[in-house]
From Swiss-Prot:
SUBUNIT field: Forms a cylinder of 14 subunits composed of two heptameric rings stacked back-to-back. Interacts with the co-chaperonin GroES.
Function: Together with its co-chaperonin GroES, plays an essential role in assisting protein folding. The GroEL-GroES system forms a nano-cage that allows encapsulation of the non-native substrate proteins and provides a physical environment optimized to promote and accelerate protein folding.
Molecular function, one GO term: unfolded protein binding
Cellular component per GO, a single term: cytoplasm
Catalyzed reactions per annotation: ATP + H2O + a folded polypeptide = ADP + phosphate + an unfolded polypeptide
Residue ranges of the region described as Disordered: 527-546
GO biological process: protein refolding
Family named by the database record: Belongs to the chaperonin (HSP60) family.
E.C. number: 5.6.1.7
Protein name: Chaperonin GroEL
Organism encoding this protein: Rhodospirillum centenum (strain ATCC 51521 / SW)
Listed HAMAP family: CH60 (MF_00600)
Principal subcellular localisation of the protein: cytoplasm
InterPro entries in the record: Chaperonin_Cpn60_CS, Cpn60/GroEL, Cpn60/GroEL/TCP-1, GroEL-like_apical_dom_sf, GROEL-like_equatorial_sf, TCP-1-like_intermed_sf
Length: 546
């Protein structure tokens, strides 16, 4: 086992604090509407430019291992806040740095670290309760757009686009962000259920110019096995022909004779038909077919359920207003399933999302939920150069997470104001002893840090602004750094999601509390490599053969 290097007490804390400061100082320049960019070197290609706190934090790795431990702990704060709320990572980093700094001073002055930490914990819980009590529900589309705009660094176009996407796909719908090849940023909304399987044969196409198959008010047959012959299907095919409506077949696969027969019938005009493979694999495929059945008001033809192809009637088939099939995707628009059944299925999938421990499964379940509940919106981010597109995509991602958080837990006054005024709630707290009281004071001081930093990044004096706001004492009164003026933050449209503010403080205090109570640090001792031996001299040439 390699030898270890151990540091104790103030030595350990000084090193750790240095690491915290390096990381936090790099991250906090990005805070606020006038925050600056950070340029990150990449091992290949152009450097990356970003204003996203967690992206900056992830890139920082220090050469001194003890300093690096401090930096990695604060990186954890940013990462945790990003995972939980999707935004607020820079605020969390600024708060963590402020709590650690003040905490280190308290410990150096001889206070009991555990009591100081208890004081911090009590204060944080009080502040969180206070912020929640002042939270307002998001009621209008404009408020959603404002939250998005603030998170996208004042770019109103992004805020509006996200609000529009959320309006179209609903709160359960999925909004994805992709890089576009064009200059413009655009929104593309797919209503209904879309899955990534296209037509099995180009002969199914109904619109040759666009190479798509469009079926108006079709019947939909959902079959979980492979279709290799059509003999068993003849009764249902005849019934569909009688009804003069098109048919979509979704099966594990349609091969050989079955596919050839369908294509021939389609070309002769006897039967308007298209066939696609079912999405997913294994159990997930079964679940997705079941989703489609509920959405379209049909049944999955499955031998597990005792249903055979020969016995299928028209009533067992699903129906939809329209189905559009391209070579890569199939979209079912306006399925005929009952609202109650769809709602029950949504509740069931939500329960599975709560229970699952796998991130991959959770992601897939959320996709299924979105397809059932509303649809999928894609924001394609454009720009003049690849660097610009990547920078903007970071901001759109942040804005999207922030708006989701706002819908979930409501909104509070932005610009660090909600945290600043929460200091009033701390006045009512009574501490058990002096050290705990100091812990409460640490949080009181730290809550001023975001407002100070936002003002500083905008070129104003943070202390003066904090003083003015506390003097005024109105909970929504703040400083709009973008315009350089004081006023009601809600009227300015400067608002933050409650969830983001809460998560930033809780995550910052959690890690900062651990750093304050650290008394020893253990790191690998670098092994000294033995110096390379001197090269041997030239040998004589006596043994050479000629």
């Amino acid at each position: 086992m390699a030898a270890k290097e151990v540091k104790f007490g103030s030595d350990a804390r000084a090193k750790m604090l240095r690491g915290v400061d390096i990381l936090a100082d790099a991250v906090k320049v990005t805070l606020g509407p006038k925050g600056r960019n950070v340029v990150i070197e990449k091992s290949f290609g152009a450097p990356r430019i970003t204003k996203d706190g967690v992206t900056v934090a992830k890139e920082i790795e220090l050469s001194d291992k003890f300093e690096n431990m401090g930096a990695q702990m604060v990186k954890e704060v940013a990462q945790k806040t990003a995972d939980l709320a999707g935004d607020g990572t820079t605020t969390a980093t600024v708060l963590a740095q402020a709590i650690v700094r003040e905490g280190a001073k308290a410990i150096a002055a001889g206070m009991n670290p555990m009591d100081v930490k208890r004081g911090v914990d009590v204060a944080v819980q009080t502040v969180v309760d206070d912020i929640k009590s002042r939270s307002r529900k998001v009621t209008t589309n404009d408020e959603i757009a404002q939250v998005g705009t603030i998170s996208a660094n004042g770019e109103a176009e992004i805020g509006k686009m996200i609000a529009e996407a959320m309006q179209k796909v609903g709160n359960e719908g999925v909004i994805t962000v992709e890089e576009a090849k064009a200059l413009e940023t655009e929104l593309d909304v797919v209503e209904g259920m879309q899955f990534d399987r296209g037509y099995l044969s180009p002969y199914f196409v109904t619109n040759a110019d666009k190479m798509v198959a469009e079926l108006e008010s079709p019947y939909i047959l959902l079959f979980e096995k492979k279709l290799s012959g059509l003999q068993a299907m003849l009764p249902v095919l005849e019934a569909v022909v009688q009804s003069s409506r098109p048919l979509l077949i979704v099966a594990e696969d349609v091969e050989g004779e079955a596919l050839a027969t369908l294509v021939v019938n389609k070309l002769r005009g006897g039967l308007k038909v298209a066939a696609v493979k079912a999405p997913g694999f294994g159990d997930r495929r079964k679940a997705m077919l079941e989703d489609m059945a509920i959405l379209t008001g049909g049944q999955v033809v499955s031998e597990d359920l005792g249903i055979k192809l020969e016995n299928v009637s028209l009533e067992m088939l699903g129906q939809a207003k329209k189905v559009v099939i391209t070579k890569d995707n199939t979209t079912i628009v306006d399925g005929a399933g009952s609202k109650e059944d769809i709602q029950a299925r949504i509740v069931q999938i939500k329960a599975q999302i709560e229970e699952t421990t796998s991130d991959y499964d959770r992601e897939k379940l959320q996709e299924r939920l979105a397809k059932l509940a509303g649809g999928v919106a894609v924001i394609r981010v454009g720009g003049a150069t690849e660097v610009e597109v990547k920078e903007r995509k970071d901001r759109v991602d942040d804005a999207m997470h922030a708006t989701r958080a706002a819908v979930e837990e409501g909104i509070v006054a932005g610009g660090g104001v909600a945290l600043l005024y929460a200091t009033k709630a701390l006045d009512k707290l009574t501490a058990v002893n002096e050290d705990q009281k100091f812990g409460i004071d640490i949080v009181r001081k730290a809550l001023q840090a975001p407002v100070r930093q936002i003002a500083q990044n905008a070129g104003f004096d943070g202390s003066v602004i904090v003083g003015k706001l506390l003097e005024k004492g109105e909970t929504n009164f703040g400083f709009n750094a973008q315009a350089g003026e004081y006023g009601d933050m809600f009227k300015f449209g400067v608002i933050d999601p409650t969830k983001v503010v809460r998560a930033a403080l809780q995550d910052a205090a959690s890690v900062a509390g651990l750093l304050i109570t650290t008394e020893a640090m253990i790191g690998e001792k670098p092994e000294k490599k033995a110096p390379a031996g001197a090269p041997g001299g030239m040998g004589g040439m006596g043994d050479m053969d000629f």
